[in-house]
Amino acid sequence: MTSTPHHPDLRSQLETLTTEAFRPELAEIDQLPTLDIARLMNGEDATVPAAVAERLPEIAAAIDAVAVRMARGGRLIYAGAGTAGRLGVLDASECPPTFNTGPGQVVGLIAGGPDAMVTSIEGAEDSPELARADLDALALTADDTVVGVSASGRTPYAVGAVEYARSLGALTVGLACNRDSALAAAAEHGIEVVTGPELLTGSTRLKAGTAQKLVLNMLSTITMIRLGKTYGNLMVDVRASNEKLRARSRRIVALATGAADDDIERALTATDGEVKDAILVLLADVDGPTAARLLAESGGHLRAAMAAALG
């Protein structure tokens, strides 16, 4: 089946999107000196945080809802195509080393599968059926959250993922960069960060992509803070999988406890390198197994485990 008959309709849709708008004042940008183009681009990028700031109440409400589900064992699943999909995969892939999340706890789905991370997969973004199949492969539950990500807010893969997830009782979030988007309307929590026309007409990897990155940073990071994955602003659930991270682990324990280096090494040895446990050993003067038990009983929240140990 050819998709040619849909092209006029799609063109008219795109022409109504702010992210696709043409800016005649930039029509001769290619004639400018490089530094002037860089200044223009930097000025455009500087507008993105303000656009995100306008949506902070919606972002916070979504985060609180996600944290409730994840505390029950649910997963955070991003679904998008192209740049939006890649940003979701990026955010998901950074959660295990940063927050010691379990395998599959934060998932990035991109239309067309892993190959689409580096290669354009023709037609994949136009398939809501593909989104349903990808979610079926994850055996979605009502405790899971699906975040559809699409600059236009109309990408069939992202909209299809959200609609299907919602039909199964999962929590849904729709992140778009245009007002009145189908994606935000389909989701329980709609977040529309309107970044305006791009420097290059329709190149939504620019301001829209930056906005999506900022919002995804918030979704994962603040959710993990709510889940007790941090102690203050320290990454106490960091996974020490290489020498840099092992050094960071020692530094985090030092910052949290003020203990001497020898004491930190002993605590990390006694807790098999677990930063949270080592901090509890040092601050509450308990042994490794007791620290592990207290943390398990407090759902991994270090402050709660500390209160139990000292109370």
Curated annotation (Swiss-Prot):
**So, what pathway does this thing act in?**
Amino-sugar metabolism; N-acetylmuramate degradation
Kindly give the PANTHER family that the UniProt entry links to this protein: GLUCOKINASE REGULATORY PROTEIN
> PROSITE patterns annotated for this entry?
GCKR, SIS
Also noted in the record is: A lyase-type mechanism (elimination/hydration) is suggested for the cleavage of the lactyl ether bond of MurNAc 6-phosphate, with the formation of an alpha,beta-unsaturated aldehyde intermediate with (E)-stereochemistry, followed by the syn addition of water to give product.
Q: What protein family does this chain belong to?
A: Belongs to the GCKR-like family. MurNAc-6-P etherase subfamily.
Recorded E.C. number(s)? 4.2.1.126
Question: SUPFAM superfamilies recorded for this chain?
Answer: SIS domain (SSF53697)
Briefly, what is this protein's role?
Specifically catalyzes the cleavage of the D-lactyl ether substituent of MurNAc 6-phosphate, producing GlcNAc 6-phosphate and D-lactate.
Stored NCBIfam families: N-acetylmuramic acid 6-phosphate etherase, PRK05441.1, PRK12570.1
The record's HAMAP family line, in alphabetical order, gives:
MurQ
Q: Pinpoint the SIS domain residues.
A: 66-229
Q: From which domain of life does this come? A: Bacteria
| Keyword match Acetylation | no
Which Gene Ontology terms cover its molecular function? Answer: carbohydrate derivative binding; carbon-oxygen lyase activity; ether hydrolase activity
What quaternary arrangement does the UniProt entry report? Homodimer.
The chemistry this enzyme catalyses reads:
N-acetyl-D-muramate 6-phosphate + H2O = N-acetyl-D-glucosamine 6-phosphate + (R)-lactate
Which Cys-Cys disulfides exist here?
none
**What's the name of the protein?**
N-acetylmuramic acid 6-phosphate etherase
